[in-house]
Amino acid sequence: MPATPSLKVVHELPACTLCAGPLEDAVTVPCGHTFCRLCLPALSQMGAQSSGKILLCPLCQEEEQAETPMAPVPLGPLGETYCEEHGEKIYFFCENDAEFLCVFCREGPTHQAHTVGFLDEAIQPYRDRLRSRLEALSMERDEIEDVKCREDQKLQVLLTQIESKKHQVETAFERLQQELEQQRCLLLARLRELEQQIWKERDEYITKVSEEVTRLGAQVKELEEKCQQPASELLQDVRVNQSRCEMKTFVSPEAISPDLVKKIRDFHRKILTLPEMMRMFSENLAHHLEIDSGVITLDPQTASRSLVLSEDRKSVRYTRQKKNLPDSPLRFDGLPAVLGFPGFSSGRHRWQVDVQLGDGGGCTVGVAGEGVRRKGEMGLSAEDGVWAVIISHQQCWASTSPGTDLPLSEIPRGVRVALDYEAGQVTLHNAQTQEPIFTFTASFSGKVFPFFAVWKKGSYLTLKG
């Protein structure tokens, strides 16, 4: 927009063009000049000219029809805008040059062919546009506030969940500590019991041995005395003395009974397993916490035309009527299969799938390599880049080469898949019974993706979580 140098704002009282003093009870005549009311002659004093007109402005001698004289217009509040060139009040606005105009500017040659209107009229379209923009901004502000409110609610829900999980973790570890403390007390009590049994049997052993030592001491003393007797006395009871002197076999008692020794050995073996049990528990806990149970969804760009995905991309079902979908090098066209998203090139990950089979239907659940064949006939084996189990109503087998029949106690209605990329393992469990289904070992290169296939009407798979 061009600058408007003709505009100035007067902050002092404008002067009267007749008396040159400050305006008092100012009025503006139609030509635009401003005077004090007392300085402006009365209309009757100005008189009618021969032309039938009345002089309304003593300065410029502008005339108006006598029958339609214009009354003086009161001057607006002080400090209003005046033309810098003519010193007159601004009444008009030029749309072409975007300039403010006084009466003289309006009548000048520069703006004769331009669109000129009163300020109040000229400003209206701008006010309308501003109001429209204001409404749009207000709506945008309200929408942002609504979004902020919703996000704050989500945040509050998440914080509440975190607080709940913190409580669950604390409760779980408190219970674990209580259980460990209880087991510690039981083990120590058992050890004290064994210790008491040892001391008891030791006391019994010492008592028996002491009694035997005392008996033998008395016999030794008696025999020593016999040896000092004269021959006539010694021979009197020779047979009795001989029988008493015969060696009696002393059965030495065992300090610890074999039964107690067995109990101690058995308990010792249990104690030896404690460090290993603790190590395994610690490793399993760490392994469980390291596993990424992130959200898995189905990738529509890879889905066969025979599959229908749910709006949330968590469920897939088979349809006999192939869908009209754009062709893509990523899309399966030989097998009713679909990949999950995202793919993985490191770490531990797991996901769970609910299985529902229609009459004669089946499904495949596992992982597939990034380069798995997607066009034409494809194989389902580890050699083809697929590590999965194939499930039907009657049987379940692993995609090894050749396939491995899996004699399970029941056909899984849910499968939990655990991927350990660095270890090169894909482990599948029955999600309901926790029964192991199969474990693949492989050397992965590149990304691997969750892999699903389903066939026959009425068959579908649903990702959990």
UniProtKB/Swiss-Prot annotation:
Checking CDD domains in the record gives: Bbox2_TRIM10-like, RING-HC_SHPRH-like, SPRY_PRY_TRIM15
What's its top-level EC category? transferase
Residues the entry annotates as binding Zn(2+): C83, H86, C105, H111
GO terms for biological process? innate immune response; negative regulation of intracellular transport of viral material; negative regulation of non-canonical NF-kappaB signal transduction; positive regulation of RIG-I signaling pathway; positive regulation of type I interferon production; suppression of viral release by host
ZnF endpoints (B box-type): 78-119
Q: Which Pfam families match?
A: PRY, SPRY, zf-B_box, zf-C3HC4
Calcium listed as a keyword: no
Q: Name one GO molecular function term.
A: molecular sequestering activity
Per UniProt, which keywords does this protein have?
Cell junction, Coiled coil, Cytoplasm, Metal-binding, Nucleus, Transferase, Ubl conjugation pathway, Zinc, Zinc-finger
Q: E.C. number, please?
A: 2.3.2.27
Its subcellular locations are:
Cytoplasm; Nucleus; Cell junction, Focal adhesion
Q: Does the keyword Lyase apply?
A: no
Coiled coil (UniProt feature): 126-229
Describe, by residue range, where the zinc fingers (RING-type) fall in the chain: 16-61
Q: Which domain of life is it from?
A: Eukaryota
Assembly: Interacts with paxillin/PXN; this interaction recruits TRIM15 to focal adhesions. Interacts with TRIM8; this interaction prevents TRIM8 cytoplasmic translocation.
Q: Which PANTHER family does the UniProt record give?
A: E3 UBIQUITIN-PROTEIN LIGASE TRIM (PTHR24103)
What family is this? Belongs to the TRIM/RBCC family.
Task: Name it.
Answer: E3 ubiquitin-protein ligase TRIM15
Can you name the source organism? Pan troglodytes
